[in-house]
């Protein structure tokens, strides 16, 4: 009974919140909405089981197909319409609206950061579940399923159409390829609001942290460390570049970062390597700051090449000059929204009435794409607690209020799409 009273209060608040004045309000006496919220609490075990089972289906970068097929099956089993996998691997399910209300997307990403062969067996210790990917983003996928199920079973009628999506390519070199495809083709011009459920917790990101990522390679003929001594060395050039990058000064606000995350090169201790490479990541929510650090890094890369080639005189060295290639492995757009934006105010109002507070921030997620296109979008957490994201020791804690994640997502979707 207490849950039903809380749900009614939440629904009433959302109905009158300034954030949704332009939307079809969620009526405070809507029994279907209250039933959906109650179900998401009482069926928390069901949601958790989806999370466990999906985690144990490997989904390495660019290899999400097995998990996608299972996700398609589960969405179809809920009775959603037009459930299909598009040409890049996104799983899309449609729940048609009753009128001409806003179109809302609720999405979680299928891919993980872990390579093929990673053991993804879930181990349970009390309320703690441990496995690579259990939080990022199998929690999000489970929440999307839970909300879709609650809407179906409670019989909620939304004015606008709601799409439930499991998308590919969110992580790393996936470069948001699933979202780029969706917003560039099948759903171009059709989406009014986008919500990504990514990771655990109850945070909200309304800003898009942009990033530039490069794979940089220095190449030369290489040779014996003693016999060929005196020719330019790709590893030395790489070292010069890394040292220069490490000394770059960046602003604290807006937070701007850089990182050399991977280095490769060399065959033996007594060889001058024929090549050396590194992967560089730089991030900022501000386009100007990102462009500035990008310019500094590119300058340093060229200076390192010139310095290493100039270091060694003579015709032998001149014939063995190094070259450099810079391959782009990821570009994520920046973007921002005011806290007064309807989608943000709706999310904050829903959180408040569910009894928790949260603050807006910025992150790099699927929401980057719609935000950069001027489409209102946010990333929210799926409830519970995540530890050790992107590590083999990743874990998810099923906290006493973890059901708030699915409830929050459901309220936001209902308020934005409108409920009859």
Identify the function of each model-found stretch.
Residues 8-17:
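Bacterial N-terminal signal peptides
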Residues 20-60, 208-210:
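N-terminal hydrophobic or amphipathic helices/low-complexity stretches enriched
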Residues 49-102:
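A non-catalytic alpha/beta surface segment that caps or lines the substrate-entry region
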Residues 94-139:
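Catalytic-core environment of secreted peptidases
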Residues 120-131, 219-223, 389-393:
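Glycine/charged-rich beta-loop-alpha catalytic/anionic-binding loops adjacent to active sites
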Residues 128, 133-211, 251, 270, ...:
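Acidic/histidine-rich catalytic neighborhood of metal-dependent amide-processing enzymes
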């Amino acid at each position: 009974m207490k849950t039903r009273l809380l749900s009614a209060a939440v629904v009433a608040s959302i109905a009158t919140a300034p954030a949704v004045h332009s939307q079809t309000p969620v009526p405070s006496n809507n029994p279907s909405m209250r039933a959906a919220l109650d179900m998401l609490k009482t069926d928390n075990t069901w949601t958790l089981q989806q999370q466990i089972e999906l985690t144990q289906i490997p989904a390495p970068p660019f290899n999400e197909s097995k998990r996608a097929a299972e996700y398609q099956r589960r969405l179809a089993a809920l009775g959603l319409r037009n459930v299909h996998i598009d040409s890049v691997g996104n799983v899309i399910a449609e729940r048609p609206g009753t009128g001409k209300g806003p179109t809302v997307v609720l999405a979680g990403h299928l891919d993980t950061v872990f390579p093929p062969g990673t053991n993804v067996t879930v181990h349970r210790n009390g309320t703690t579940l441990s496995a690579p990917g259990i939080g990022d983003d199998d929690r999000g996928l489970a929440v999307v399923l839970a909300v879709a199920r609650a809407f179906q079973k409670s019989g909620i009628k939304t004015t606008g159409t709601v799409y439930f999506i499991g998308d590919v390519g969110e992580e790393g070199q996936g470069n948001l390829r699933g979202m780029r495809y969706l917003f560039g083709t099948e759903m171009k011009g059709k989406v009014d609001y986008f919500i990504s459920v990514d990771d655990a917790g109850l945070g909200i990101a309304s800003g898009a942290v942009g990033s530039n990522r490069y794979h940089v390679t220095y190449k030369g003929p290489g040779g014996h460390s003693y016999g060929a001594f005196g020719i330019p060395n790709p590893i030395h050039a790489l070292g010069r570049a890394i040292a220069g990058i490490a000394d770059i000064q960046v602003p604290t606000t807006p937070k701007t970062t850089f990182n050399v995350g991977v280095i490769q090169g060399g065959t033996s201790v007594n060889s001058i390597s024929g090549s050396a490479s590194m992967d560089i990541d730089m991030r900022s929510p501000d386009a100007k700051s990102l462009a500035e650090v990008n310019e500094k890094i590119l300058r340093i890369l060229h200076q390192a090449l010139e310095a290493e080639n100039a270091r060694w005189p003579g015709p032998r060295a001149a014939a063995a000059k190094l070259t450099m290639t810079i391959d782009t492995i990821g570009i994520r757009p920046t973007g921002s929204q005011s806290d007064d934006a309807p989608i943000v105010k709706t999310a904050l109002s829903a959180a408040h009435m569910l009894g928790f507070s949260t603050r807006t921030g910025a992150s790099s997620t699927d929401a980057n794409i719609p935000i950069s296109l001027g489409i209102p979008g946010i990333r929210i957490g799926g409830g519970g607690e995540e530890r050790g994201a992107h590590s083999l020791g990743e874990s998810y804690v099923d906290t006493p209020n973890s059901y708030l994640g699915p409830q929050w997502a459901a309220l936001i979707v209902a308020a934005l799409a409108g409920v009859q």
